[in-house]
């Protein structure tokens, strides 16, 4: 009984150490990978306050198949 517990413990420790070794020595980003990445700028948007959907502006500013709706007091574009 003690031998089987010891064997299970040793196998567990080996699996855990292999997992940690793979995670620590994982793939690192190189300079060539970084050059291919995309960057995006985030711009703050003006928030339209509302009480109902009718308080929101026309939906032509939203993407196709979206409309302005009032959610928690703010006008947001929602999917149809």
Curated annotation (Swiss-Prot):
It is found in: Secreted. Disulfide bonds join 50-70, 56-75, 62-77. It comes from the Eukaryota. Coiled coil: none annotated. Keywords: Antimicrobial, Disulfide bond, Fungicide, Plant defense, Secreted, Signal. GO terms for cellular component: extracellular region. Its main location: secreted. One of its GO terms (biological process) is defense response to fungus. Residues 1-29 form the signal peptide. Belongs to the DEFL family. This is Defensin-like protein 291.
